Curated annotation (Swiss-Prot):
One of its GO terms (cellular component) is molybdopterin synthase complex. Pathway: Cofactor biosynthesis; molybdopterin biosynthesis. It is found in: Cytoplasm. It comes from Drosophila sechellia. One of its GO terms (biological process) is Mo-molybdopterin cofactor biosynthetic process. It catalyses: 2 [molybdopterin-synthase sulfur-carrier protein]-C-terminal-Gly-aminoethanethioate + cyclic pyranopterin phosphate + H2O = molybdopterin + 2 [molybdopterin-synthase sulfur-carrier protein]-C-terminal Gly-Gly + 2 H(+). This is Molybdopterin synthase catalytic subunit. Its EC number is 2.8.1.12. The gene is Mocs2B. Pfam families: MoaE.
């Protein structure tokens, strides 16, 4: 069993031994980290520990899982860390493990100590005696990235400015004194703050409030009404729309086009655009196209403008749905000439060619 805890009181070592006790275990290894009274010649009075509790517990549980994956015979694992002020000689951390054999217990505890120092977000502050200031200690074993040593050191390269040098007025964008500049900055910050507050009211505050209440001092923090949506990390409500018809069904319904063809097949013979075209005036062909496209017909309008509107309508229909094809079926025109038929040339044998040549020589072919 895993026992992971962050405590603010002194750690009871006897209680740790009770957690490790098991009839099937022949070895228990316990590490106790305590506060020492000196550091580099300075007298240490105590240590102060702070932690990111939720993340620290999560990492400590991960360490327990890693231990069990490496040493399968481990029975009980204990990781206790104390927070707050820890005086000299008192325990700040206890790591213990029990197993049937001593090798697994010793190796697992040693591994857990190194992982705790490397991965768990716990910070230590040393409090010294006398005039020495307290100091937060850097964890040199941490795997978190540190500042790059190759970064540019601006302090080592000070910029010298000659006060006597006059800057051209063309290079100065703002020509006001410090008071006016501070006033402008304050106005800008206040305006951005008002914009954020108004947006928070729109996103978070309830619109169903009584008009008799004074809401001049209200804000989203005190009167927030939005409830977090289930299975979502967003506070705004999200809806999923499933279109039962249209081009989006092409992927979800493989037979959509076939079903559409069957459904619209009965309507194909209801109207015959060619009959109307033959009966109407010379521009009747364009009028028929406009009627099928759902466009209003104006005979006084320029014909090129009407054709342009028809083209735009076709592009729109092509972009939104394939159904338009059933309303604009192209029929072959009776005025179009039929394509020429292919004529297969006759093949002659050698005897037929010889007879034909002989007839030409005799002149009987032309007589």
């Amino acid at each position: 069993m895993d026992h992971v805890k962050l405590v603010n009181d002194p750690i009871d070592i006897a209680h740790i031994h009770q957690l490790l006790a098991d009839e099937g275990c022949g070895a228990s290894s316990v590490f106790v980290g305590t506060t020492r009274d000196n550091f580099q010649g300075k007298k240490v009075l105590s240590l102060a520990y702070e932690a990111y509790d939720s993340m620290a517990l999560k990492e400590m549980n991960k360490i327990c899982s890693d231990l069990r994956s490496k040493w399968l015979d481990l029975k009980h694992i204990v990781i206790y860390h104390r927070l707050g002020t820890v005086p000299v000689c008192q325990a700040s951390v206890v790591i213990a493990a029990s197993s049937p054999h001593r090798s697994e217990a010793l190796e697992s505890v040693s591994f857990a100590i190194d992982q705790l120092k490397t991965r768990v977000p716990i910070w230590k502050k040393e409090i010294y005696e006398g005039d020495n200031d307290s100091e937060w200690k850097e964890n040199k074993e941490s795997i978190r990235p540190k500042k790059s040593k190759s970064g540019f050191n601006y302090a080592a390269c000070p910029c010298k400015v000659e006060e006597s040098h006059d800057v051209p007025r063309t290079l100065v964008q703002i020509r006001v004194n410090d008071a006016e500049l501070a006033k402008r900055l304050e106005c800008f910050v206040n305006r951005k703050r008002d914009e954020i507050n108004s947006q928070n009211v729109i996103d978070f505050k309830s619109s169903f409030v009584s008009s008799d209440k004074d809401l001049s001092d209200s804000c989203a923090r005190t009167q927030s009404t939005i409830i977090k949506q289930e299975q979502s990390n967003c506070h705004l409500k999200v809806r999923r729309v499933n279109n039962r018809c249209g081009p989006q069904q092409m992927e979800m319904r493989p037979n959509y086009e076939l079903e559409l063809n069957k459904l619209m097949g009965s309507r194909d013979g209801q109207t015959d655009p060619t009959k109307e075209m033959r009966k109407s005036l010379p521009n009747s062909r364009l009028q028929a196209i406009e009627s099928y496209m759902g466009l209003t017909t104006d005979n006084e309008e320029n014909i090129f403008s009407r054709i342009k509107r028809v083209e735009n309508r076709l592009l729109q229909l092509e972009s939104i749905s394939p159904e338009y094809r059933h309303f604009t079926k192209r029929e072959p025109s009776s005025m179009e000439a039929a394509p020429p038929k292919k004529i297969r040339k006759k093949s002659y044998s050698a005897q037929e060619l010889s007879a034909f040549i002989q007839k030409v020589k005799d002149g009987s072919e032309f007589s």
